Amino acid sequence: MAAQGWSMLLLAVLNLGIFVRPCDTQELRCLCIQEHSEFIPLKLIKNIMVIFETIYCNRKEVIAVPKNGSMICLDPDAPWVKATVGPITNRFLPEDLKQKEFPPAMKLLYSVEHEKPLYLSFGRPENKRIFPFPIRETSRHFADLAHNSDRNFLRDSSEVSLTGSDA
């Protein structure tokens, strides 16, 4: 009889676990801890950095670098941030970031001052020969790509291997 009481108690405790939902924790590997959603005039911003979701940080981050050099994390869901960053990412990144041939770890640095991208980096974690984080071999400086307006450079640069062979 006592064994039946313990088994019922154990069953009740295990059933309570069904209703427990893990709380959203702050990802410590994300760059932004606190996000700013109030409007910042573009004439005060020097660069905008867009960092897409990675295995280390499960959210998109938008970082504005004002002309004084500090960094301000912007709320990517704020309407003015979407209106500012949307055309930039649509112009310089692939249409569908969820496709398998495009890597999930991407970072874009855009110069508001000069109205051009400065840096794009990404990696492909599913390919063991390529690092899943930005390094020199998987990064492209847009100075090299200024003459190329075709979007296919993203596919070409994402397939840079560490061994130097594409096999």
UniProtKB/Swiss-Prot annotation:
Annotated tissue distribution: Expression restricted to the lung, produced by bronchoepithelial cells and is released into the airways. Expressed at low levels in fetal lung.
Organism field: Mus musculus
Induction (record text): By inflammation; in lung.
Entry's localization field: Secreted
Physiological role: Chemotactic for neutrophils. Involved in lung-specific neutrophil trafficking during normal and inflammatory conditions.
GO cellular component terms, semicolon-separated: extracellular region; extracellular space
Family: Belongs to the intercrine alpha (chemokine CxC) family.
Name used for this protein in its record: C-X-C motif chemokine 15
Gene3D superfamilies (alphabetical): 2.40.50.40
